[in-house]
Amino acid sequence: MNLRVPQLRFEASDELASLCKAGGDPLRLNVLRALANDSFGVLELAQIFATGQSGISHHLKVLAQARLVATRREGNAIFYRRALAQTELFCGKLHAALLDEVDALELPAEVQQRIAVVHSQRAAASHDFFARIADSFQAQQDLIASLPQYRDSLLGLLDSLNFASSATALEVGPGDGGFLPELARRFAQVTALDNSPAMLELARQRCEREGLANVQLELLDALSQSAASADCVVLNMVLHHFAAPAEAIKQLTPRINLGGSLLITELCSHNQSWARDACGDLWLGFEQDDLARWASAAGLMPEESVYLGLRNGFQIQVRHFRRPLAALTVR
């Protein structure tokens, strides 16, 4: 007589074991540290950690099974980022505690250098794109979202902030200068920064046509320490061209005067990969939670947000973050 042995079910302990296993390897812990405020593809992580693609893919699979990383497909590439800990769920507190300890790690110098190389490769690709398409910039921009499609919503949010008549503004990456006239009418002084001479020339021509005497154009990397500060910093459909968006927000925060605002207009996350080649986008939009998390990590407070659906299937997010008068405690 054959007796059937009941199969024991250990779903909860399996989940806990998976999390413990994922955190039990130094390379995986360093991968989590590298993903603290960035997203990388498999090939980029293989380059950063000087590891074969198959090896890094195995480690990422273990991290994904433990729900420590989330994936996002952009065209044929899959990008990895850290998953947020949900402390109300089973294993959530351990997940959060693990990430807190990981954030105390300092990545080896050679890993930091390779991350910088990956960022510079991304930045070079974006810079080369704008050098090539300056003459057709507006047509390229219109493929996704032209300024008239979201201008009223952006201006409505901007006007609701009630800046003083003496307030100043800084626009990063003004493109052909399409938003500069609106800023010039609302601020005493406007500074526009761009690292592309071709694009800055388009902005200069617009300022000349419109007689914008209170706009100053500077050929300068916005993340440069010599960049000006202002009461309102504007990133209008430009963050997706940054090599490291979270780091960009962190470095731009000191450019915002205390009590001032950061206005970000961006695409929500999408999967239309043609935007990379047609529009030079390094990122296919952003998750709403990611922008909020990056801003919070930089010491900014989330304020009003507006979301717009466009007829071509894209969604735009208009986000407002404020720099408090007193410094926040940033973990």
For the regions a protein language model found, what residue spans apply to each?
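Conserved alpha-helix/loop element of class I SAM-dependent methyltransferases that forms part
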Residues: 145-166
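A short glycine-rich, Lys/Arg-flanked "PGG" loop and its adjoining helix->strand segment in the class I
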Residues: 247-261
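A short SAM/SAH-binding and catalytic strip from SAM-dependent methyltransferases
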Residues: 232-244
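A short acidic, Gly/Pro-enriched loop at the edge of an enzyme's catalytic core
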Residues: 223-233
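Class I SAM-dependent methyltransferase SAM/SAH-binding core
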Residues: 170, 175-224
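C-terminal alpha-helical "lid/dimerization" subdomain adjacent to the S-adenosyl-L-methionine
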Residues: 261-320
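Amphipathic alpha-helical dimerization/coiled-coil segments
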Residues: 2-5, 89-136
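N-terminal helix-turn-helix DNA-binding core of bacterial DNA-binding proteins
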Residues: 14-55, 78-85
